[in-house]
Swiss-Prot record:
GO CC aspect terms: cytosolic large ribosomal subunit
Domain of life of the native organism: Bacteria
Family indicated by similarity: Belongs to the bacterial ribosomal protein bL27 family.
Gene3D superfamilies linked: 2.40.50.100
GO MF assignments: structural constituent of ribosome
Name of this chain's protein: Large ribosomal subunit protein bL27
Organism the protein comes from: Synechococcus sp. (strain RCC307)
């Protein structure tokens, strides 16, 4: 008989680091060209006028200006779009 209890094993004990996704600049905020507006996985928010999209779907400003969000109606559902109005 064992005098000590065996340690056993578990399949838990792992977690990934947070990816800091979300909106970084809100509507009405002034931004400079290259500023990151939204970090996202997939295109939950679409790029509008003066907004570029990175290969990881990050949206960023192409010009200096003011951020504004708008809702656009598609055939199946409503989508959000972010634009930058030049100053």
């Amino acid at each position: 008989m064992a005098h000590k209890k065996g340690t056993g094993s578990t399949r838990n004990g792992r977690d990934s680091n947070a990816k800091r996704l979300g909106v970084k600049r809100y509507g009405g905020e002034k931004v400079t060209a290259g500023s990151i507006l939204i970090r996202q996985r997939g295109t939950s928010v679409l790029p509008g006028v003066n907004v570029g999209q990175g290969k990881d779907d990050t949206l960023f400003a192409l010009v200096d200006g003011v951020v504004n969000f708008e809702t656009i109606r598609r055939a199946t559902r409503e989508r959000k779009r972010v634009c930058v109005t030049p100053l």
